[in-house]
Amino acid sequence: MRKDIHPDYRPVVFLDTTTGYKFLSGSTKTSKETIEFEGETYPLVRVEISSDSHPFYTGRQKFTQADGRVDRFNKKYGLKDANAAK
């Protein structure tokens, strides 16, 4: 196996810029910023979305695609909504 072909894997702190949530994880991501976390200094990587702010994990998910494939098919062929008839 060749040496020095893989990036360095080390602990990195990720900061969710939306919520301010910080978590420590192993990564090869590099950063010039550092942060003090749990008494140690780690590289800091800023992220816009994490499990703390993503709608799927927070339960605040919105369905933006109201006109799906089935709705378009029904509209195209003039079919009534089966649920509305009940």
UniProtKB/Swiss-Prot annotation:
Database matches in InterPro entries: Ribosomal_bL28/bL31-like_sf (IPR034704), Ribosomal_bL31 (IPR002150), Ribosomal_bL31_B (IPR027493), Ribosomal_bL31_sf (IPR042105)
SUPFAM superfamilies found in the cross-reference section: L28p-like (SSF143800)
One annotated Gene Ontology cellular component of this protein: ribonucleoprotein complex
BP-aspect Gene Ontology terms: translation
One Pfam family this sequence matches: Ribosomal_L31
Keywords, comma-separated and alphabetical: Ribonucleoprotein, Ribosomal protein
GO molecular function annotation: structural constituent of ribosome
First and last residue of the signal peptide: none
Gene3D superfamilies associated with the record: Ribosomal protein L31
Keyword Ribosomal protein listed: yes
UniProt subunit comment: Part of the 50S ribosomal subunit.
Recorded family membership: Belongs to the bacterial ribosomal protein bL31 family. Type B subfamily.
Protein name in the entry: Large ribosomal subunit protein bL31B
Gene encoding the protein: rpmE2
